[in-house]
Amino acid sequence: MAKVLVLYYSSYGHVETMAQHVAEGAKSVPGVEVTLKRVPETIPADQAKAIGVKVDQAAPVATVDELPNYDAIIFGTPTRFGNMAGQMRTFLDQTGCLWMKGALVGKIGSVFASTGTQHGGQETTITSFHTTLLHQGMVIVGVPYACSGLVNMSEITGGTPYGATTLAGADGSRQPSANELDIARYQGKHVAELAVKLAS
């Protein structure tokens, strides 16, 4: 049984929605156990509520120590100036103990993201995230062009060969589109299929 963790941070629910669909795609693969978790919020609760952060997310909070239990980890993050969110960075900065042991070497790592605008850094967020995963010795998996949603030219849409993405709009009012959610499901399924092969 291959174990897949979908681990995300979401301020306003866009990445949370994407994460749920990534997990859905992974669950469609036989022989896979899928876990959906989030990283801890670092903004004090009163401040988070004041700025509209979605604090009532159902996914439980992950710990660094549990990461080696999975064969694949699919990370989700909003973009912060072309990089991952600080909450995800803070979580990953605590994985030095895992790096020392080589605990994540050979495990699959994959990333999906959200941005406020069409050219708001979705690709740089994912590719810069890959650097951390490579230092951990993880095997990077993206979204191949076999996923037809990547070549959809009929609408403004997220989605890259590096990973699924969604465009939230500068004010956060845009929700993930059907095409973006299809790509998210594809990414989850693709990673899960590879995890099964590596675990066998």
From Swiss-Prot:
Binding-site residues, substrate: W99
GO cellular component: membrane
Transmembrane segments: none
Catalytic activity, as annotated: a quinone + NADH + H(+) = a quinol + NAD(+); a quinone + NADPH + H(+) = a quinol + NADP(+)
Binding site for FMN: 10-15, 79-81, 114-120, 135
Needed co-factor(s): FMN
The EC number(s) this enzyme carries: 1.6.5.2
Keywords on record: Flavoprotein, FMN, NAD, NADP, Nucleotide-binding, Oxidoreductase
Cofactor: record remark: Binds 1 FMN per monomer.
Protein name: NAD(P)H dehydrogenase (quinone)
